[in-house]
C-alpha cells in the first residue's frame, strides 16, 4: 500500500504525467456522462424488454462494451464496436490485398491512409448498424417512443445521432491516446466493462447472503478465490513470451563496429489476444438471430445452441475459439516476412540457415505456442459458463473469463507500463519497481 501511495505522489510530481492523467480522467468522465443520455423521444422507463434481451449472447457483449448504453438506448448505444469491426476488416485486408500490404510498408504515410479507410468503413458500418438497432428497439420496446412521435420520422434523426455518438467516442479515444495515458480506444472499452462491475458485484453479494444459512458465505469466498486465481493466471500467461535469439553480423564503418550483438524476437503465447473469442461469439450469435426472426418451432439441437450453459453450446464454442486462434495467429504473424526482414538486416537465428529454414523454424515455434495458448483462451472463454454451475449470477459471471477478463488484464497492464515509462523518464520508479527517486545509477542505467 505504501508503494502504491508513493507511486501516486510520483505521478503528481511529474507535471506532464499529471496533465495526461487528468485529461484521461476528464475524457472518460465525458464518455460515461454521455452513456446516460437517452435518445430524444425515448422513454427510459419503457426499455425493460430491451434490457432483458441483452442478458445473453452477442447482445450482452455489445451492452458490456458500451457500459450499459446499448440497453439504455443512449446516444452512445453503438459504442466503439463499429470502429473495432472496421479495424478487424482492415487487418484482414492488409493480409489478403496487395494494395493494403503496400500501405503497411509505407510507414507513417501508409498508416494515415489506412486510418482514413478505417474511418470511412466505420461510417458505412454505422449507417447499417444504427437502423438495425432502431428496428430491434421498435420490435422489443415499441412503447418506449413518446406518444405522438412516429417511428418512421424518428428513425432518420436517431440514425444520425447514433452515428455521431460513435464517431464522438472515437474522437475521445484518439484524444486520450494523443494527450492522455494508455490506448484511448482500449481504455473506453475497459471503462464500459468496469462500469458494470459494481452492480454485478452487489447482485452477487445479495444473492449469496440471502442464502447464508445454506452456505452462501462459503460459496462467495470460494468464488472470490477462483476469480483471483483466474486473474493471476491470465496476467502471467498474457505476458508469456518465447524469446527467439537473433544474431546480427558485425559491420565496421570507419573506426566503429556495429552489430554483432544478440537480440531476441518475442513471440507471444497469446498472439491473437481476445480476437478469437469475439469471432466465436459472433458466430454463436447466428442461431439466436435466426430464431428471433423465425416463426417456426425451434428444434431441440437449436435450443441447445441457444443455451450458453449447455454442453453442446460450449463444445462448439471451444472448437471455434481454438480454430480462430490458429487462423488469427496465421494472418497476423508472417514467418516468411519475418525471415526476409531478418536476412535483409544481416540477421540470423543461431544454428538455423537464413531464408526458408528460418521461416520454417519460426512457424514451428509459433505452432508450439499456439496450441497451449488456444487451449487456455478456450478455457477462459467458457469460464462464465463454468461459473454458472456454481450458481454465480450471469452479470458477475462475465468477469470470470471471456472477453471482459482478457480486455481488462491487457488494458491495465498496458496502461501501467506506459505510466511506468513516464516515471522512468523522470528518474522515478513506479508500481513495477521500488517506489523511490532514482539516483545517478538509475540515470546512467536509463
Please place each PLM-identified region on the residue numbering.
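N-terminal cationic and glycine-rich segments that engage phosphates or anionic surfaces
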Residues: 1-104, 109-446
Amino acid at each position: 500500500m505504501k508503494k502504491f501511495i508513493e507511486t501516486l505522489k510520483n505521478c503528481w510530481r511529474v507535471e506532464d504525467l499529471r496533465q495526461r492523467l487528468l485529461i484521461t480522467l476528464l475524457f472518460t468522465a465525458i464518455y460515461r456522462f454521455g452513456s446516460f443520455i437517452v435518445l430524444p423521444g425515448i422513454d427510459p422507463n419503457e426499455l425493460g424488454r430491451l434490457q432483458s434481451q441483452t442478458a445473453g449472447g452477442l447482445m450482452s457483449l455489445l451492452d458490456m462494451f458500451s457500459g450499459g448504453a446499448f440497453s439504455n438506448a443512449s446516444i452512445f448505444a453503438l459504442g466503439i464496436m463499429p470502429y473495432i469491426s472496421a479495424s478487424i476488416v482492415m487487418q484482414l485486408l492488409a493480409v489478403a490485398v496487395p494494395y493494403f500490404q503496400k500501405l503497411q510498408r509505407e510507414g507513417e504515410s501508409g498508416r494515415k491512409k489506412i486510418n482514413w479507410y478505417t474511418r470511412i468503413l466505420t461510417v458505412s458500418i454505422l449507417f447499417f448498424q444504427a437502423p438495425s438497432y432502431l428496428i430491434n428497439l421498435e420490435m422489443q420496446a415499441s412503447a418506449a417512443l413518446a406518444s405522438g412521435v412516429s417511428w418512421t420520422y424518428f428513425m432518420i434523426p436517431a440514425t444520425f445521432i447514433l452515428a455521431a455518438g460513435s464517431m464522438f467516442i472515437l474522437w475521445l479515444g484518439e484524444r486520450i491516446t494523443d494527450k492522455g495515458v494508455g490506448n484511448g480506444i482500449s481504455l473506453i472499452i475497459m471503462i464500459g466493462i468496469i462500469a458494470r462491475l459494481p452492480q454485478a458485484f452487489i447482485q452477487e453479494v445479495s444473492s449469496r447472503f440471502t442464502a447464508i444459512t445454506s452456505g452462501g458465505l462459503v460459496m462467495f469466498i470460494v468464488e472470490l478465490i477462483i476469480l483471483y486465481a483466474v486473474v493471476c493466471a491470465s496476467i502471467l500467461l498474457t505476458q508469456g513470451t518465447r524469446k527467439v535469439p537473433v544474431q546480427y553480423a558485425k559491420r565496421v564503418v570507419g573506426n566503429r563496429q556495429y552489430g554483432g550483438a544478440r537480440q531476441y524476437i518475442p513471440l507471444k503465447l497469446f498472439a491473437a489476444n481476445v480476437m478469437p473469442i469475439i469471432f466465436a461469439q459472433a458466430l454463436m450469435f447466428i442461431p439466436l438471430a435466426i430464431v428471433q426472426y423465425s416463426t417456426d418451432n425451434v428444434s431441440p439441437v437449436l435450443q441447445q445452441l441457444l443455451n450458453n450453459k449447455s454442453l453442446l453450446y460450449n463444445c462448439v464454442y471451444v472448437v471455434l475459439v481454438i480454430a480462430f486462434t490458429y487462423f488469427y495467429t496465421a494472418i497476423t504473424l508472417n514467418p516468411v516476412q519475418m525471415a526476409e526482414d531478418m536476412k535483409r538486416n544481416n540477421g540470423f537465428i543461431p544454428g538455423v540457415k537464413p531464408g526458408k529454414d528460418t521461416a520454417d523454424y519460426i512457424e514451428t515455434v509459433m505452432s508450439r505456442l499456439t496450441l497451449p495458448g488456444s487451449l487456455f483462451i478456450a478455457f477462459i472463454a467458457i469460464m462464465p459458463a463454468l461459473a454458472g454451475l456454481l450458481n454465480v449470477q450471469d452479470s458477475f459471471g462475465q468477469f470470470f473469463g471471456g472477453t471482459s477478463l482478457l480486455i481488462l488484464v491487457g488494458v491495465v497492464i498496458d496502461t501501467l507500463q506506459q505510466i511506468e515509462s513516464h516515471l522512468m523518464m523522470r528518474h522515478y520508479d513506479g508500481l513495477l519497481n521500488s517506489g523511490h527517486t532514482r539516483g545517478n545509477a538509475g540515470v546512467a542505467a536509463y
